[in-house]
Curated annotation (Swiss-Prot):
PTM description: The N-terminus is blocked.
EC number: 1.1.1.195
Subunit (UniProt): Homodimer.
Protein name as it appears in the record: Probable cinnamyl alcohol dehydrogenase 1
Residues given in the record as NADP(+) binding sites: 49, 167, 188-193, 211-216, 251, 275, 298-300
This protein's encoding gene: CAD14
GO molecular function: cinnamyl-alcohol dehydrogenase activity; coniferyl-alcohol dehydrogenase activity; zinc ion binding
Pathway recorded for this protein: Aromatic compound metabolism; phenylpropanoid biosynthesis
PANTHER family recorded: ALDEHYDE REDUCTASE
The organism's place on the tree of life at top rank: Eukaryota
Species in which this protein is naturally found: Nicotiana tabacum (Common tobacco)
GO biological process: alkaloid metabolic process; lignin biosynthetic process
Length: 357
């Protein structure tokens, strides 16, 4: 196990200010505690939330800030009380690295709703050290917030599942939408949206992609396996599709009207919000009243659900569509992500980027 009290440093790529530009940054890892594992990072996905974080879009960022919360790595050290993992295991780390363990949500195994949850970056751990994310050589994480990657699953493919994948799996699981034969809509075809199509199809759903243009029609239907494609500005087609969907997963990360999409839902249908939007959304109340429809939200998923989701994706052969880049390309990747110029998730080859050279 090595000396658990020896202070270690690691190298990551951090933003220093709201410009969001990342550059190399050396910092101290916290000590490996009794229930901690040290993870050598292999791959880390790039999520739209990383953009919000490094650019301080929500007014809560503290710098220097190492982003990255779709982390796949190899266990290189374990604390004496670790029972779930051993050195050499391939594991994943998502957006959370801590919670209080005592509140209602924690006792219900939905720790993502704990008021004292600890984010994997831009937060402070229980020992007072700042948390830093997966665009780095290594991390130290409590074993509760680490999951084993199923044997045979490619690590670069697993990375986006730890945020994009669980973000769509959790609401489908919680709201009772796992059974086959349902009709679902995916609003927005980015990193989360493309996983929504794949996971919903694997559950046996009829899936309609809803987008603002025809640009992604061929991709959605021929490559991702969607059953239908709606352009939201095509009023005739939108009218034809009214009252047809059991649910819509809304992944759009910018302000947009809700009423056109509420009209697509059946009675008791759910519009499930996923995008992080810092401006108010508007709708008129009869749009929900007259169909007993719901506007709700969901936030990533629990550790238990994440394990279930990984097993589900392995069993069903669900993979993510990715573009692998090295760390020295990360600022360009972020610029492209901001312009939606990626099909559909950037994954950083951290181990291949040789950060210590």
């Amino acid at each position: 196990m090595g000396g658990l009290e020896v202070e270690k440093t690691t190298i990551g790529w951090a933003a220093r200010d709201p410009s969001g530009v990342l550059s190399p940054y050396t910092y101290t890892l916290r000590n490996t505690g009794p229930e901690d594992v040290e993870v050598k990072v292999l791959y880390c996905g790039l999520c739209h939330t990383d953009l919000h974080q490094v650019k301080n879009d929500l007014g809560m960022s503290n710098y220097p800030l190492v982003p990255g919360h779709e982390v796949v790595g190899e266990v290189v050290e374990v604390g004496p009380d670790v029972s779930k993992f051993k050195v050499g295991d391939t594991v994943g780390v998502g957006l959370l690295v801590g919670s209080c363990r005592n509140c209602g949500p924690c006792k219900r195994d939905i720790e993502q709703y704990c008021n004292k949850k600890i984010w994997n970056c831009n937060d402070v751990y229980t020992d007072g050290k700042p948390t830093q994310g997966g665009f780095a050589k290594s991390m130290v994480v409590d074993q509760k917030f680490v999951v084993k990657i199923p044997e045979g699953m490619a690590p670069e493919q697993a990375a986006p599942l730890l945020c994009a994948g669980i973000t769509v799996y959790s609401p489908l699981n919680h709201f009772g939408f796992k059974q086959s034969g349902l009709r679902g809509g995916i609003l927005g075809l980015g990193g989360v949206g493309h996983m929504g199509v794949k996971i919903a199809k694997a559950m046996g759903h009829h899936v309609t992609v809803i987008s603002s243009s025809n640009k992604k029609r061929q991709e959605a239907l021929e490559h991702l396996g969607a059953d239908d494609y709606l352009v939201s500005s095509d009023t005739d087609k939108m009218q034809e599709a009214s009252d047809s969907l059991d649910y819509i997963i809304d992944t759009v990360p910018v302000g947009h009207p809700l009423e056109p999409y509420l009209s697509l839902l059946k009675i008791d249908g759910k519009l499930i919000l996923m995008g992080v939007i810092n401006t108010p959304l508007q709708f008129i109340s009869p749009m929900v009243m007259l169909g007993r429809k719901s506007i709700t939200g969901s936030f990533i998923g629990s550790m238990k659900e994440t394990e279930e989701m990984l097993d589900f994706c392995k069993e069903k052969g669900v993979t993510s569509q990715i573009e692998i880049v090295k760390m020295d390309y990360i600022n360009t990747a972020m610029e492209r992500l901001e312009k939606n110029d990626v099909r559909y998730r950037f994954v950083v080859d951290v181990i291949g980027s040789k950060l210590d050279q």
